């Protein structure tokens, strides 16, 4: 052991005192000085004779029997997170503020077709594939990637396609200063090229979500084509230069359709997407509706008091919704019985219980009165009548009176 490189010796019987913070609780300061930049920097700052060891430590060290200085212990990485059956590492050091927000009351699907859909998407995400995810409104497309970003601490950005918006500004835009005009890099360009920089200086690649991509107009689709070139590992800059995309960056797109436009008349803002753009995505998936068992747990979590007081109302709602979804699949009902609709119906029932009380009411009374928040969203009278007809055999007491008129809003 080279004693000349270990610093000076404190007076016999005394502990060395740290010149930085005054610490004197050890015979040897070498381990303590790791928090102040290390022994070498300490001696450079306070002189080669600065006290770093006690007389007792020096005596043992000179005889070769002093304990070896401890190496700093590296902090352990957080355990991986399981997202629908697929394990993902957590990006330590990435704050929640840099990730997409965790949706309120979000539950990772565990049952039914949607759980299978999400597991396949997670496999593709694990492999860093570019993904197109479609599904009816309210099936949780954006929420899925927001939850994944939040749970894995993956930095994320969501860009929503709005008709008429300037998508080029996501990459760059003109800015003005005293010297005239200049190009100003946009948030998307910097995210694709630079990633997210942690406090320790290391970078973590982003997940980029392009939401409602099938709403893009023809001119917007041309800009999206340039953005999607980044899937090939490069992104165009303002002067035509090509920047490399940070390895590990993932681009996903969400849409109501599979790129062929709306063929049901329910999402009329959806446009036809050029096949050359669709081909840029390595994987494409269509989300199913959530399984009623998973939906029931979400409703119970959102409205625990009502669920406790009226334990059969929510299950009855979900039976109605399931019946409607079967009709949609057969093209017998032109409506979107999504989870948003279920939540609105359940919320209206819970609101009724809080504000007006439900004394003297039955399950059927509550279901009928609160159902108008769903029925009144129907686009026309034919659809409203069809919804009421699908409810009638399931709701206790029915929804159609003996005279044939509906009693959905009966007080």
Task: List the model feature ranges, each with a label.
Residues 1-14:
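Short, intrinsically disordered linker segments that flank or connect zinc-binding domains
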Residues 11-12, 27-51:
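C-terminal recognition-helix end and immediately following basic linker
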Residues 18-21:
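Short cysteine-rich clusters marking metal-coordination/redox-active sites
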Residues 24, 39-40, 49, 155, ...:
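Short coil/loop linkers at secondary-structure junctions
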Residues 24-27, 259:
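Short functional micro-motifs and their immediate structural scaffolds
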Residues 38, 49, 54, 274, ...:
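Helix N-terminus capping/helix-initiation residues
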Residues 41-67:
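Chromatin/DNA-recognition segments of nuclear transcriptional regulators
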Residues 69-411:
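C-terminal regulatory/interaction module of P-loop NTP-utilizing enzymes
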């Amino acid at each position: 052991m080279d004693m000349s490189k270990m610093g000076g010796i404190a007076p016999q019987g005394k502990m060395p005192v740290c010149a930085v913070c005054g610490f004197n609780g050890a015979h040897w300061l070498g381990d303590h000085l790791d928090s102040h930049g290390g022994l070498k920097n300490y001696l450079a700052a306070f002189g080669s004779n600065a006290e770093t060891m006690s007389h007792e430590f020096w005596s043992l060290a000179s005889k070769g029997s002093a304990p070896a200085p401890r190496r700093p212990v590296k902090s352990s990485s957080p355990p991986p997170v399981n997202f629908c059956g697929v394990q993902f590492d957590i990006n330590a050091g990435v704050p929640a503020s840099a990730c997409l927000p965790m949706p309120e009351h979000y539950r990772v699907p565990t049952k039914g077709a949607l759980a299978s859909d999400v597991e396949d998407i997670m496999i593709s995400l694990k492999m860093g594939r570019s993904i197109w995810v479609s599904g009816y409104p309210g099936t949780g497309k954006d929420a899925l990637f927001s939850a994944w970003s939040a749970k894995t601490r993956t930095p994320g950005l969501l860009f929503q396609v709005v008709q008429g918006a300037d998508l080029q500004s996501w990459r760059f835009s003109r800015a003005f200063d005293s010297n005239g005009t200049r190009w100003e890099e946009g948030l998307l360009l910097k995210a694709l090229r630079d990633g997210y920089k942690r406090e320790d200086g290391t970078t973590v690649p982003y997940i980029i979500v392009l939401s409602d991509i099938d709403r893009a107009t023809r001119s917007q689709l041309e800009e999206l084509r340039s953005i999607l070139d980044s899937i090939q590992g490069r992104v165009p800059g303002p002067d035509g230069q090509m920047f490399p995309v940070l390895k590990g960056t993932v681009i996903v797109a969400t849409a109501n359709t599979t790129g062929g436009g709306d063929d049901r008349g329910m999402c009329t803002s959806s446009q036809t997407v050029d096949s050359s753009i669709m081909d840029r995505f390595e994987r494409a998936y269509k989300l199913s509706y959530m399984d009623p068992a998973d939906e029931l747990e979400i409703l119970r979590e959102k409205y625990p008091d009502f669920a406790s007081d009226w334990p059969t109302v929510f299950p009855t709602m979900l039976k109605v919704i399931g019946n409607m979804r079967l009709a949609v699949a057969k093209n017998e009902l032109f409506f979107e019985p999504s989870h948003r609709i279920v939540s609105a119906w359940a919320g209206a029932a819970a609101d009724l219980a809080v504000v007006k009380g439900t004394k003297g009411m039955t399950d059927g009374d509550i279901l009928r009165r609160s159902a108008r928040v769903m029925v009144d969203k129907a686009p026309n009278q034919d659809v409203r009548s069809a919804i009421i007809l699908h409810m009638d055999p399931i709701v206790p007491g029915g929804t159609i009176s003996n005279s044939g008129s509906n009693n959905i809003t009966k007080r």
